[in-house]
Amino acid sequence: MQQEGFRGYFLQPGHLDLQRQHHQLNIAYGELLDVLTASKTAVEGTYTAGDTVTYVVTLRNTGTAPLAGLTVTDDLGSYAFGTSATLYPLTYVSGSVNLFINGVLQPTPTVTAGPPLTITPVTIPAGGDAVLVYQAQANEFADPSQGGSIINVVTISGDGLAADATATATVTADAEPQLAISKSISPSQVTDNDRISYTFILQNSGSAALEATDNAIITDVFDPRLSALSVTYNGAAWTEGVQYTYDTATGLFTTLPGALAVDAATVTQSVTTGAYTITPGLATLVVTGTI
């Protein structure tokens, strides 16, 4: 989002004294124009817990003189919590700042991680531009639930400015399933003709459920191959050809589209610290067979 240039006015009355005669002259009007424009964008439009967001701040000097020694301050998405606390949902990624002046990479300015994050000095030549690229990580104070967002404001200040310039970028919480899967075997030691179980745990850390219409599938090759399969999903028996297929010749096991569904994660925010906790939605697939 771009900050429009500040426009202000001043007036200067004139006085003339001639041999003890006081004359009021006309009043001259002048206009103060802010020659700095600022915009800020987020490369990634969405985030999940722990994600890194890349920000690009573009500053343009439309004046005829350089703007020297500017300070760029990023509020890292600060918001009020409770009666007096301020929380920061972003953590600056150390060493990520790059400064370009008219497209040329510059030595890294002084960076204070904060919060808030400050970058100084930034000098923009007359008619030129400066581009700052840096990263921040969504931390435990970033709302991961559906409808969550981080509103991030950058402020540019300095003696050469008629007023501070600001620009804003907003990223929203990802509203998709975030799946992880683990596999275990029981018992761990078996002999021929023993029964063995493979347990698959599906975890959904996302703010949206995995629906049957998403047509997610699991495939696995059992080696050694199994026979006389029995399959359950969340404790309910599955039927071969309806929820899964199994090739006894190759050991290939495949769930069929529409068979898998996993609840969305549950999100809670501590009333004491303001930190968010994610409890993943879970589903359990158990495949049992004879070696």
Predicted regions and their residues:
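Exported/extracytosolic protein signature
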Residues: 1-291
